């Protein structure tokens, strides 16, 4: 309040006869006034009394992990929505700075745990570009990478549709989705030895070749999966309850997607056919025939349709991969960069098979020294930086990788699509109903392991 003003009902104190004038030579005089409390009370008095703040999560079955949603609501209407993240922070990016370039694969595969092959591929493509060996990657290794990534896309979308349907009251798609996903995880286990967190894709190629029954397992899956996907599609696509809960819900048009940096099925549901497999191909994707499905619904139902069509396109790509597979190496030949991947592991799983010992120790002393340094110190990557992106089931998964010329990364940063796409929660949910928040978040399909890292 200024010095010349008086509050109502108060008298101004008499001024002294000779007020002391401040010495302003060399100093700045600042007149500080108090808070305008009248304006504050008027603003608060005009607010609606029934507006409350509700925490949805982080322990909630419909938030896809430990996502916390802070909702300010008036009755059933969401006035403001904010995301609270960080509950699954694991410090993976920092840990990579203390591990060799080869060991990093074991860490990054655990970030977005529903699409581990994409984490591994993006990391390995970055290391290979820094090493300048992108053109030396064996063709068989690139084909197997594409095959595994597309199977992983199907398994990830199955989880999205299964959990999204369950959250809206459709229990049967939940059972069907996880039943079909189990078939894909069985194939992963046959090929890599693990259902999740595989660390199978390595800089320079693959950890080892496909097992003898690997191709047969994939072909059995391809024979069964189209019918299973149709059964699941019939449960949801024309379901009147599912359509009522998803159509015109979670609306986000192309302008909003571009402003927020949204990618993946959310962006393609707004009508833009942006797919890195087409615009910036990697692993030979430019040689495969597939379509990029789009819709113009800009809502949860449109994102559901996109994922259904993407699973069909992934099956087409997997079939092409099987037709292209030819015998050959799955790791570059440079022994200074990678140890043999064509040899089977020993019973202890540590590679101590007679074939390994004969190849490494029985060839030459120089080869033994190189292998010892490769295992203990790791490879040295030339100094530089690179950004590599792949099209994951949730959108653009990018890696910014910096090397100082040593055996460990100087910095590895992941641009996870779940983290970016969660910015759209406010735009999708504000002005809608509380029940529609569940459908909107499910249509984004965030994985908190990738968000928090």
UniProtKB/Swiss-Prot annotation:
InterPro entries associated with the record: NADH_Q_OxRdtase_suD, NADH_UbQ_OxRdtase_49kDa_CS, NDH1_su_D/H, NiFe-Hase_large
Protein name as it appears in the record: NADH-quinone oxidoreductase subunit D
Basic and acidic residues composition bias: residue spans: 1-21
Record-stated family: Belongs to the complex I 49 kDa subunit family.
Region described as Disordered: 1-30
HAMAP family: NDH1_NuoD (MF_01358)
SUPFAM superfamilies, per database record: HydB/Nqo4-like
Localization annotation: Cell membrane
Record field: catalytic activity: a quinone + NADH + 5 H(+)(in) = a quinol + NAD(+) + 4 H(+)(out)
Function: NDH-1 shuttles electrons from NADH, via FMN and iron-sulfur (Fe-S) centers, to quinones in the respiratory chain. The immediate electron acceptor for the enzyme in this species is believed to be a menaquinone. Couples the redox reaction to proton translocation (for every two electrons transferred, four hydrogen ions are translocated across the cytoplasmic membrane), and thus conserves the redox energy in a proton gradient.
EC number: 7.1.1.-
Keyword NAD: yes
EC primary class: translocase
Keyword tags: Cell membrane, Membrane, NAD, Quinone, Translocase, Transport
Quaternary context: NDH-1 is composed of 14 different subunits. Subunits NuoB, C, D, E, F, and G constitute the peripheral sector of the complex.
Gene3D superfamilies with a match to the protein in the record: Cytochrome-c3 Hydrogenase, chain B
Membrane topology per record: Peripheral membrane protein
Organism: Nocardia farcinica (strain IFM 10152)
GO cellular component, one term: plasma membrane
GO MF term list: NAD binding; NADH:ubiquinone reductase (non-electrogenic) activity; quinone binding
């Amino acid at each position: 309040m200024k010095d010349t003003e008086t509050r109502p009902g108060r008298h101004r104190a008499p001024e002294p006869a000779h007020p002391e004038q401040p010495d302003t030579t060399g100093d700045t005089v600042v007149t500080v006034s108090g808070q305008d409390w009248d304006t504050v009370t008027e603003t608060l008095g005009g607010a609606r009394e029934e507006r409350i703040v509700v925490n949805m999560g982080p322990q909630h079955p419909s938030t896809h992990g430990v996502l916390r949603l802070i909702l300010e609501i008036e009755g059933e209407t969401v006035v403001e929505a904010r995301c609270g993240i960080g509950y699954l922070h694991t410090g993976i990016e920092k840990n990579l700075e203390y591990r060799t370039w080869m060991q990093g694969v074991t860490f990054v595969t655990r970030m977005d745990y529903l699409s581990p092959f994409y984490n591994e591929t993006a990391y390995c493509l970055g290391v290979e570009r820094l090493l300048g060996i992108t053109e030396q990657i064996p063709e068989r290794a690139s084909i197997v990478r594409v095959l595994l990534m597309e199977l992983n896309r199907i398994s990830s979308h199955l989880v999205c549709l299964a959990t999204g349907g369950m959250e809206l009251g459709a229990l049967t798609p939940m059972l069907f989705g996880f039943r079909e996903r189990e078939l894909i995880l069985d194939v992963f286990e046959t090929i890599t030895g693990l259902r999740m967190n595989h660390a199978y894709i390595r800089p320079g190629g693959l950890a080892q070749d496909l097992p003898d029954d690997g191709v047969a397992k994939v072909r059995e899956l391809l024979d069964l999966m189209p019918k299973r996907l149709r059964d699941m599609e019939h449960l949801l696509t024309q379901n009147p309850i599912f359509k009522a809960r998803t159509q015109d819900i979670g609306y986000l048009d192309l302008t909003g997607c571009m402003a927020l940096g949204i990618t993946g099925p959310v962006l393609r549901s707004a009508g833009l056919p942006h797919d890195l497999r087409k615009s910036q191909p990697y692993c030979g994707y430019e040689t495969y025939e597939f379509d990029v499905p789009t819709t113009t619904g800009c809502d949860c139902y449109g994102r559901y349709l996109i994922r259904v069509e993407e699973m069909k396109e992934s099956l087409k790509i997997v079939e092409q991969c099987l037709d292209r597979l030819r015998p050959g190496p799955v790791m570059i030949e440079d022994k200074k960069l990678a140890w043999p991947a064509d040899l089977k592991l020993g019973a202890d799983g540590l590679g101590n098979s007679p074939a390994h010992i004969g190849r490494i120790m029985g060839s030459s002393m120089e080869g033994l020294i190189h292998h010892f340094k490769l295992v203990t110190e790791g490879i040295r990557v030339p100094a530089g930086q690179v950004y590599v992106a792949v099209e994951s089931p949730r959108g653009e998964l990018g890696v910014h990788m910096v090397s100082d010329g040593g055996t460990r990364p100087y910095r590895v940063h992941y641009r996870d699509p779940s983290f970016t796409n969660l910015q759209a929660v406010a735009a999708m949910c504000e002005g809608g109903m509380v029940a529609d928040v569940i459908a909107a978040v499910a249509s984004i399909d965030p994985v908190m392991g990738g968000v928090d890292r």
